[in-house]
UniProtKB/Swiss-Prot annotation:
Pfam families given in the database record: DUF188 (PF02639)
Protein name: UPF0178 protein AZOSEA36080
Family affiliation: Belongs to the UPF0178 family.
InterPro entries, sorted: UPF0178
Length: 150
């Protein structure tokens, strides 16, 4: 099992939580982005730079994903592909995507895209709060504790 990160849009504070978790648990963490990344040096942390382009990083994550891997992403279509491939998907606010909620989230995303394309100002997501960071760290720790103990 390893952790994949859709790193282009992943907040720095979430990456820092992931770095610490990889070091603590010995679980391989791979950050995938279309720009250079400079994580701390570690046996457990790798980067994978992909060419620029629409969904190139997402496609590379899905291509390399193994059943049971964890993907950290806010990209709902990527999360849907991860779930379909037998992986786990967690967003930076600590919410797991699942077979039970992914369809509704995709529909909501498509609806918001339709609103935006018709000129409605929908705004973006709120900034991550300290509580969001704590929820993410707790859910990640719970997930890794289950995986590492198995």
């Amino acid at each position: 099992m390893q952790i994949w990160v859709d790193a282009d849009a992943c907040p720095k504070v979430i990456k820092e939580i992931l770095y610490r978790a990889a070091e603590r648990t010995g679980v391989l963490l791979t950050l995938v982005a279309n720009q250079p990344l400079f994580p701390p040096r570690s046996l457990w942390i790798k980067t994978l730079q992909v060419p620029p382009g629409f969904d190139v990083a997402d496609n590379e994550i899905v291509r390399r994903l193994a059943t049971g891997d964890l993907v950290v992403t806010a990209d709902i279509p990527l999360a849907a592909e991860v779930i379909a491939c037998g992986g786990h998907a967690l967003n930076p606010r600590g919410e797991f995507y699942s077979t039970e909620n992914i369809r509704e989230l995709l529909n909501l995303r498509d609806f918001m895209d339709t609103l935006r394309s018709s000129g409605v100002q929908t705004g973006g997501p709120a900034a991550l709060t300290q509580a969001d960071r704590q929820v993410f760290a707790n859910r990640l720790d719970q997930f890794l504790a289950r995986i590492v103990s198995d």
